[in-house]
Curated annotation (Swiss-Prot):
Protein name listed in UniProt: Phosphatidylglycerol--prolipoprotein diacylglyceryl transferase
Species: Phenylobacterium zucineum (strain HLK1)
Any Pfam family hit: LGT
Binding site for a 1,2-diacyl-sn-glycero-3-phospho-(1'-sn-glycerol): R144
GO MF annotation, one: phosphatidylglycerol-prolipoprotein diacylglyceryl transferase activity
Recorded family membership: Belongs to the Lgt family.
Upper lineage: Bacteria, Pseudomonadati, Pseudomonadota, Alphaproteobacteria, Caulobacterales
Membrane-topology annotation of the record: Multi-pass membrane protein
Gene that this polypeptide is encoded by: lgt
Transmembrane parts of this sequence: 13-33, 61-81, 99-119, 218-238, 250-270
Disulfide bonds: none
Length: 289
C-alpha cells in the first residue's frame, strides 16, 4: 500500500516549525507525568510500602526526565549509530531538529537521572525506577507513531498485503529521492507502537494495579526492561538495519546488541525483587490520601 501523504510539520509559524515528532515527545512526557501523579495518589497501589516520592517530587522530576531523554537520546544515537560525525561534523551533534534519537541512549540517560534524583532527594532508587518504568510505554507509543508519520525507521521488504511503500511526492521533493526505495516494507514503526507501547503498557498496568508489584522493589522496572528487550529483539528481525550497520558480527543488528544487556538486567531485577521479603501491610493512616 502507498505511504500516506503525511506532512512531518504540524504547524508552520514563520520560521518556527512544530513537528509531529516534537509533539509526540511533549504528549508522552505530559501524559506520563499525569499518570505517575495519579499512581502516587492511589492508595490501593501502596499496600505494603508508601509511595517513593510525593506528587511535588514527581513534578520536580519531570524536568530531569525531559533533559535526560533529549541529551541521552541524542548522544546515544551519535555514539551507537553515527559516531563518525564526532570527527567529520561535530556541530551536527546539536542538530536534534534533523532527527536522530536513540531509545537505548534515552533509557541510559533516564536511569542516570533516576540515580541522581534519588541520591539528592534521599528516595529509594529501585522504587522510583518502578514508578518511572510504568509510564514509559506511553512515550514509546507516541514516539513510534511519529516515526511512522516521518516515514523513518521502516522495516525490511515484505510481500505481506499490509506492506507499505515508504515513498511519495512529498518525500521526493524534500529529499530528492526515496531512501526506502519503492518496494513494500514492513511498517515496523507501527509494530513497535503496538508491542512496546500498548502491549507493554497493559503488562505493566497489570503489574502495578493487578498484581500490586509496586510493593516489590525493582520488579516493575525489571518487567519493563525485560519485555522491552524481548519485543525489540523480536522486531529487529523485520526492521531494516541502520545504514552502515548492516554487517555487524553474527548477523545481529545494533538494536539487538543494545537490547541483550537490557534483557539480562531486567531478569536480574525481577529475580532480586521477588527474593526480597515484602514488609507488613501499611496501617490505613500510613497510606497516601
Amino acid at each position: 500500500m502507498p505511504f500516506p501523504d503525511f506532512d512531518p510539520v504540524l504547524v508552520q509559524l514563520g520560521p518556527l516549525a512544530i513537528r509531529w515528532y516534537a509533539l509526540a515527545y511533549v504528549a508522552g512526557i505530559l501524559l506520563g507525568w499525569r499518570y505517575a501523579v495519579a499512581m502516587v495518589k492511589n492508595p490501593r497501589l501502596w499496600t505494603h510500602r508508601p509511595p517513593p516520592v510525593t506528587t511535588e517530587q514527581v513534578d520536580d522530576f519531570i524536568l530531569w526526565v525531559t533533559l535526560a531523554i533529549i541529551v541521552g537520546g541524542r548522544l546515544g544515537h551519535v555514539l551507537f549509530y553515527t559516531p563518525q560525525i564526532i570527527w567529520t561534523d561535530p556541530l551536527q551533534i546539536l542538530q536534534i531538529w534533523n532527527g536522530g534519537m536513540s531509545f537505548h541512549g534515552g533509557a541510559i540517560g533516564v536511569f542516570l537521572a533516576i540515580i541522581l534524583f534519588a541520591m539528592r532527594n534521599k528516595v529509594d532508587l529501585w522504587r522510583l525506577g518502578d514508578l518511572v518504568a510504568a509510564v514509559v510505554p506511553i512515550g514509546l507509543f507516541f514516539g513510534r507513531v511519529a516515526n511512522f508519520i516521518n516515514g523513518e525507521l521502516w522495516g525490511r521488504p515484505t510481500d505481506a498485503p499490509w506492506g507499505v511503500v515508504f515513498c511519495n511526492e512529498r518525500i521526493r521533493e524534500t529529499l530528492g529521492w526515496c531512501p526506502a526505495g519503492e518496494v513494500a516494507r514492513h511498517p515496523s514503526q507501527l509494530y513497535e507502537a503496538a508491542l512496546e507501547g500498548i502491549v507493554l503498557f497493559l503488562i505493566l498496568r497489570w503489574a502495578t494495579h493487578g498484581a500490586k508489584l509496586l510493593n516489590r522493589r525493582g520488579v516493575v522496572m525489571g518487567l519493563f526492561t525485560t519485555f522491552y528487550a524481548v519485543f525489540r529483539i523480536s522486531l529487529e528481525n523485520v526492521r531494516q538495519p541502520d545504514a552502515g550497520l548492516e554487517n555487524l558480527p553474527l548477523g545481529l543488528t545494533m538494536g539487538i546488541y543494545l537490547s541483550i544487556p537490557m534483557l539480562l538486567f531486567g531478569l536480574w531485577l525481577i529475580w532480586r525483587g521477588m527474593r526480597e521479603e515484602t514488609p507488613p501491610a501499611l496501617a490505613p493512616a500510613d497510606k497516601p490520601a
